[in-house]
């Protein structure tokens, strides 16, 4: 069931800067969505328009089928967890979480019960009387979430709310946020520039750049099938090579012809080819599909990050559980399904239509 719809949303500021360009998206109830992109991509502007903090220059915002474009933020069934959490330092945990209910003059017995339930949901039982200054960053974030969910919103917006935490806490809170969302069954819209966060938590990701949605889909679809150079580079590490389509399921790059899994592209058309570093296997030279010479390697704990130069001068990035010798010539092997072919300038709609066409011919 659709809960949020943005219909041809544009945002242009007084100085002429266009932050959003004809944004269209539909969000279903009870899912975890991420708006992913670099600084200035428009992701936070979308969040603020949904929340009612920023007015769109054009277009409509719908909530549960109702036009809320001009509805005051305080009247929307939407709450926000801000990047800095926006907790009141002079109030303790209980008072922070209870704040919205006290403003609405709810009975004290109801407030106590709801604060207890909210703190239990975020695993802060026994913290009600703690001062905010006594809490860790992760605990402060949980208080902010408890405060945001206490009045049972239908949608929770989270604006870069993991960015201030260290790596270990960020990982921990990824699991926490996903668990909270599933327990509550409400729609989460999470803004981030961190592709790992988006991939780990989301049901669906919207990748933004320059005020436009470049691609949307499940984490697996976006990682395995990027529609353009920007998405391929922004979502994970990639080897991106210039190539030429030979025919359906055959492509040329690095001076050789390879079997691939792509079709629906004109024979002879120039394309870009994506190979993920973790899909490349290091072999003996004779067993590889291409030969490369190792230039450097870094041990990153669970794998080696290896840079190597191909015979055509292309610099390859390879992730391997086995180390190699600097200067060593090795082979690299990959399967046809590991090769992803991108048409130059193809939109997401054109990519989807092509995919449906050749999959329908199987």
Swiss-Prot record:
SMART domains attached to this UniProt entry: AAA (SM00382)
GO cellular component terms attached to this protein's record: ATP-binding cassette (ABC) transporter complex
GO MF annotation terms: ABC-type putrescine transporter activity; ATP binding; ATP hydrolysis activity
Residues of the ABC transporter domain: 4-235
Binding site for ATP: 37-44
Record-linked PROSITE patterns: ABC_TRANSPORTER_1, ABC_TRANSPORTER_2, POTA
InterPro entries registered for this protein in UniProt: AAA+_ATPase (IPR003593), ABC_SmlMolc_Importer (IPR050093), ABC_transporter-like_ATP-bd (IPR003439), ABC_transporter-like_CS (IPR017871), Mo/tungstate-bd_C_term_dom (IPR008995), P-loop_NTPase (IPR027417), PotA-like (IPR005893), PotA_ATP-bd (IPR017879)
EC identifiers of the protein: 7.6.2.11
Primary subcellular site in the record, as a coarse category: membrane
Catalytic activity as recorded in UniProt: ATP + H2O + polyamine-[polyamine-binding protein]Side 1 = ADP + phosphate + polyamineSide 2 + [polyamine-binding protein]Side 1
Keywords for the protein's UniProt record, in alphabetical order: ATP-binding, Cell membrane, Membrane, Nucleotide-binding, Translocase, Transport
Entry superkingdom: Bacteria
Cellular localisation: Cell membrane
Membrane topology: Peripheral membrane protein
Cross-referenced PANTHER family: SPERMIDINE/PUTRESCINE IMPORT ATP-BINDING PROTEIN POTA, SPERMIDINE_PUTRESCINE IMPORT ATP-BINDING PROTEIN POTA
Subunit annotation: The complex is composed of two ATP-binding proteins (PotA), two transmembrane proteins (PotB and PotC) and a solute-binding protein (PotD).
Record-stated family: Belongs to the ABC transporter superfamily. Spermidine/putrescine importer (TC 3.A.1.11.1) family.
Free-text function comment from the UniProt entry: Part of the ABC transporter complex PotABCD involved in spermidine/putrescine import. Responsible for energy coupling to the transport system.
Stated name of the protein: Spermidine/putrescine import ATP-binding protein PotA
Organism: Lactobacillus delbrueckii subsp. bulgaricus (strain ATCC 11842 / DSM 20081 / BCRC 10696 / JCM 1002 / NBRC 13953 / NCIMB 11778 / NCTC 12712 / WDCM 00102 / Lb 14)
Lineage: Bacteria, Bacillati, Bacillota, Bacilli, Lactobacillales
Gene assigned in the entry: potA
């Amino acid at each position: 069931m659709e809960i949020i719809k943005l219909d041809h949303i544009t945002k242009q500021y007084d100085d002429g800067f266009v932050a959003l360009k004809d944004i269209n998206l539909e969000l279903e109830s009870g899912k975890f969505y991420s708006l992913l992109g670099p600084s200035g991509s428009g992701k936070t502007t979308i969040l603020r328009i949904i929340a009612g903090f920023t007015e769109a220059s054009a277009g409509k915002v719908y909530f549960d089928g109702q036009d809320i474009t001009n509805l005051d933020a305080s009247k929307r069934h939407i709450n926000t967890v801000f990047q800095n959490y926006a907790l009141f330092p002079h109030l303790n945990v209980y008072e922070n979480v209870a704040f919205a209910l006290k403003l609405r003059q709810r009975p004290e017995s109801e407030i106590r019960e709801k604060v207890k339930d909210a703190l239990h949901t975020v695993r802060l039982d026994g913290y009600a009387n703690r001062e905010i200054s006594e809490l860790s960053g992760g605990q402060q974030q949980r208080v902010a979430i408890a405060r945001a969910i206490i009045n049972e919103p239908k949608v929770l917006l989270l604006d870069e709310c993991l960015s201030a935490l260290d790596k270990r806490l960020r990982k921990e809170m990824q699991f926490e946020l996903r668990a909270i969302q599933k327990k509550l069954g409400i729609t989460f819209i999470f803004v981030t520039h961190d592709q790992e966060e988006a991939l780990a938590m989301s049901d669906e990701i919207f990748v933004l750049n320059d005020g436009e949605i470049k691609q949307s889909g499940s984490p697996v679809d976006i990682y395995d099938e990027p529609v353009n150079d920007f998405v391929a580079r922004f979502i994970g590490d990639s080897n991106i090579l210039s190539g030429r389509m030979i025919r359906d399921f055959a492509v040329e790059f690095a001076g050789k012809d390879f079997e691939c899994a792509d079709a629906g592209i004109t024979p002879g058309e120039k394309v870009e080819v994506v190979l993920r570093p973790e899909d490349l296997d290091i072999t003996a030279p004779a067993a590889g599909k291409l030969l490369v010479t190792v230039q450097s390697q870094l041990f990153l704990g669970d794998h080696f990050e290896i840079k190597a130069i191909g015979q055509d001068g292309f610099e390859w990035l390879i992730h391997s559980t086995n180390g190699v010798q600097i200067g060593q010539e090795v082979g690299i092997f990959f399967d046809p399904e590991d090769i992803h072919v991108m048409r130059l300038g193809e939109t997401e709609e054109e990519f989807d239509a092509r995919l449906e066409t050749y999959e329908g011919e199987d």
